[in-house]
Amino acid sequence: MTAMEGASGSSFGIDTILSGAGSGSPGMMNGDFRSLGEARTTDFRSQATPSPCSEIDTVGTAPSSPISVTLEPPEPHLVTDGPQHHHHLHHGQQPPPPSAPPAQSLQPSPQQQPPPQPQSAAQQLGSAAAAPRTSTSSFLIKDILGDSKPLAACAPYSTSVSSPHHTPKQECNAAHESFRPKLEQEDSKTKLDKREDSQSDIKCHGTKEEGDREITSSRESPPVRAKKPRKARTAFSDHQLNQLERSFERQKYLSVQDRMDLAAALNLTDTQVKTWYQNRRTKWKRQTAVGLELLAEAGNYSALQRMFPSPYFYHPSLLGSMDSTTAAAAAAAMYSSMYRTPPAPHPQLQRPLVPRVLIHGLGPGGQPALNPLSNPIPGTPHPR
């Protein structure tokens, strides 16, 4: 009975029941036992019903409404248990008739206050459980882990239905008020972290852009090699060009003194005259090579000899009977001699020379071979 008294919040001892029976109010006694049955059913269901806060902590979903559990009417065998127990206690006292007015049975005595209705306590519990669900609307890991700590304080509210002097609403409000600054601190921390991340992203993006610009600029502008500055071309006047051409016709190669005299006469530097002569010789050799090839193909070696006199002596009888192959060979020898430009021999040592290419028809000692030429050299005896 003492356990029942602590659970219901009102004294239901033998003395209290006897005093209630002695007052002569069977309806009051019936009401006390009905309230006792309701309290017992509420205790049993509150123990069997899981805590809404524990459901939030473990599952993370909305808890089941405790109102649907506590609003069910008490079972008939628990309600009728009160009069039977009262009958056994009073040793043969008859239970009150069932036709007693319900108003008298539900009115409590001024000395004994009945426990609060389980409906109002369940409504308070539902409102207390609904408050933390609406306070945090995000389902992030930080919010769930942060909500588990303050919501764990709501675990003892599952047994608060049996105790009338317990105030779960005030404790939940105090827990929420203590949890609000924590949420504000977490929000401020997350905002600061986001700002720092954005600033770091901007910095990294800026450095990346600068690096990309440097790479693109290095690709667009390749490394400049150390080149010597190109000299500007000299613009010669007509008078200077005419004098240089006349000098080149006389001499293809100039000595150092002749080059210095010509440069002083034309108001040019020694380097400018030297460069012009080099370019002019290259052009002349190219033109000469082309002309020799054309004349060799045509077979007109006499015109070639007139155009380019050779230091070698050729007899007219040999030139008349020369074919195109021999003329091409002679032109090649002449062209090579012009490139070499051998120095002029001493006048006393100079004598007419005949190239070996041109004496293939002559015998030893300058005598004609077995096949005489069409135009023999005058004064040469014919072979017999």
UniProtKB/Swiss-Prot annotation:
SUPFAM superfamilies: Homeodomain-like. GO terms for molecular function: DNA-binding transcription activator activity, RNA polymerase II-specific; DNA-binding transcription factor activity; DNA-binding transcription factor activity, RNA polymerase II-specific; RNA polymerase II transcription regulatory region sequence-specific DNA binding; sequence-specific double-stranded DNA binding. It holds the Pfam family Homeodomain. Residues 177-217 have a biased composition (Basic and acidic residues). SMART domains: HOX. Residues 119-134 have a biased composition (Low complexity). GO terms for cellular component: nucleus. CDD domains: homeodomain (cd00086). Coiled coil: none annotated. Gene3D superfamilies: Homeodomain-like. Potential regulator of neural basic helix-loop-helix genes. It may down-regulate expression of ASCL1 and, within the thalamus, up-regulate NGN2, thereby regulating distinct patterns of neuronal differentiation. PANTHER family: HOMEO BOX HB9 LIKE A-RELATED, VENT HOMEOBOX. This is BarH-like 2 homeobox protein. It comes from Rattus norvegicus.
